[in-house]
Amino acid sequence: MKKEKAVVVFSGGQDSTTCLFWAKKHFAEVEAVTFDYNQRHRLEIDVAASIAKELNVSHTVLDMSLLHQLAPNALTRSDIAIEQKEGQLPSTFVDGRNLLFLSFAAVLAKQKGARHLVTGVCETDFSGYPDCRDVFIKSLNVTLNLAMDYQFVIHTPLMWLNKAETWKLADELGALEFVRNKTLTCYNGIIADGCGECPACVLRKRGLDQYMNEKKGANVR
């Protein structure tokens, strides 16, 4: 893979930034694509652009505002509360988001001569999102190859990692402090450690605390 080119689906959050560092290690050339889908916090796009610039990665922003029209949800509408009722998907789930993002990323990748796609979806901490499952990614990979007559490979470095293990990977890539201080995961639009209260921040902090405690314990032995 080292001699090939990859396109990373990039939001500027913890997971996709970790994947960007992973891709830079594994591929000769890396580009990033961010989607503007009228997300609640436009800062996400600015953060993604800033990180890409700092890492010297070519960055494309694609307009996906139709998602806002088709699938109102808590990530695009400030009047919808961030919550998860028993037996239902979280209000932050956007129908078709990863399907569309990866499909458009594939079109872009083919135009740029890349066949590798990298995404930070994860089944371990996937919060019930059906489009973060490994079976979906494998199915979409086959579909994209058939639809475009092109041999794409979708990479999911975080698929079987929990949040603590994702922090560990960032650390192994020499990017832990970068990811901690410069990414935007918070649903309330606060960079770095975030608000500490929304589901994304709680998951992120729990994972970081677990990893740092494990690392500390390993160093004591």
From Swiss-Prot:
Pathway: Purine metabolism; 7-cyano-7-deazaguanine biosynthesis. The gene is queC. Belongs to the QueC family. This is 7-cyano-7-deazaguanine synthase. Its EC number is 6.3.4.20. Zn(2+) binds at residues 186, 195, 198, 201. The lineage of its organism: Bacteria, Bacillati, Bacillota, Bacilli, Bacillales. It catalyses: 7-carboxy-7-deazaguanine + NH4(+) + ATP = 7-cyano-7-deazaguanine + ADP + phosphate + H2O + H(+). Keywords: ATP-binding, Ligase, Metal-binding, Nucleotide-binding, Queuosine biosynthesis, Zinc. Catalyzes the ATP-dependent conversion of 7-carboxy-7-deazaguanine (CDG) to 7-cyano-7-deazaguanine (preQ(0)). Binds 1 zinc ion per subunit.
